[in-house]
């Protein structure tokens, strides 16, 4: 079995130390194979915040990581930096690739940079990005769980969040479904949920799921939610067995002083 941990929206600069410590403990206990970090690493793209985030990732002790920038990882008040060096701090902390790719024997994970320096927070996926990701997905093996990662949500669970939905998501989801994607992971709105993308008026062509993470360690939790992360389990099916994965949401409990399983779902795949 392979295990992936999906965290998002840590917003270092607003982190809660007890929650950070609890997440490190969870990672060391469960020992995931891959860390997916779907953006908004920092609160204000400050060097000290990026340094704290990088230290945190090292403390997790996970060998493979795919990280993406979020809109908060581009300077907001430093106009010169936003115009001419929008990703300088992020790249210094997390390496030279804004659209990374991670592959293991069982996992195939493609990152898409949906931030734009000329936009305050709204995300965009371009036709070129859709085509690139589709081409990559077609190279995956059937035995691999095929995952696309964005920052802004590719689908939303409530009408009031529609304005935060990724621009260009409709055509992207259709194309990525045809190309073989199983899951699309994201963050941005600090609301964890799992959506079946193969149902509804804009249903995709084959089973595919949107999996959103809440804010992992920040004090900026939405009303009615708490700090949370996702754990995704995948085992390559034997001949004749159906493809499916498990998604667990782990919520932080101040009473317990750690993360606890809040929900577990088995997702059927094609």
Where are these regions (language model features)?
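Extended active-site neighborhood of metal-dependent phosphoesterases/phosphodiesterases
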Residues: 51-132, 140, 175, 203-207
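A general structural motif
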Residues: 1, 32, 62-64, 141-145, ...
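Active-site environment of divalent metal-dependent phosphoester hydrolases
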Residues: 13-15, 43-48, 71-82, 117-121, ...
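A short C-terminal boundary segment appended to hydrolase-like catalytic domains
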Residues: 234-270
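Short acidic, glycine-rich surface-loop motifs adjacent to enzyme active sites
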Residues: 142-157
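N-terminal active-site segment of His-dependent metallophosphoesterases
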Residues: 1-59, 77-80, 132
């Amino acid at each position: 079995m392979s295990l992936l941990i999906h965290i998002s929206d840590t917003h270092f600069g607003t982190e809660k130390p007890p929650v950070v410590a609890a997440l490190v403990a969870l990672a060391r206990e469960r020992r995931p194979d891959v860390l997916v970090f779907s953006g908004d690493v920092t609160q204000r793209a400050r060097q000290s915040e990026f340094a704290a985030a990088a230290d945190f990732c090292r403390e997790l002790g996970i060998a493979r990581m795919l990280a993406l920038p979020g809109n908060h990882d581009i300077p907001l008040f430093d106009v010169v930096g936003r115009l001419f060096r929008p990703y300088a701090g992020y790249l210094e902390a997390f390496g030279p690739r804004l659209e990374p790719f991670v592959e293991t024997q069982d996992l195939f994970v493609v990152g898409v940079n949906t931030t734009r320096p000329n936009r305050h927070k709204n995300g965009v996926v371009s036709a070129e990005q859709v085509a690139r990701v589709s081409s990559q997905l077609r190279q995956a093996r059937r035995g691999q769980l095929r995952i696309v990662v964005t920052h802004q949500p590719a689908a939303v669970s409530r009408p009031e969040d529609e304005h935060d939905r990724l621009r260009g998501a409709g055509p992207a989801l259709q194309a990525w479904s045809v190309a073989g994607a199983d899951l699309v992971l994201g963050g941005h709105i600090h609301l964890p949920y799992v959506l079946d993308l193969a149902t509804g008026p804009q249903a995709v062509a084959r089973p595919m799921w949107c999996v959103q993470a809440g804010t992992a360690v920040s004090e900026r939790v939405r009303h009615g939610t708490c700090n949370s992360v996702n754990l995704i389990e995948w085992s390559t099916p034997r001949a004749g067995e159906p493809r499916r994965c498990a998604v667990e949401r782990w919520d932080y409990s101040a009473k317990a002083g750690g993360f606890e399983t809040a929900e577990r779902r088995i997702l059927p795949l094609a």
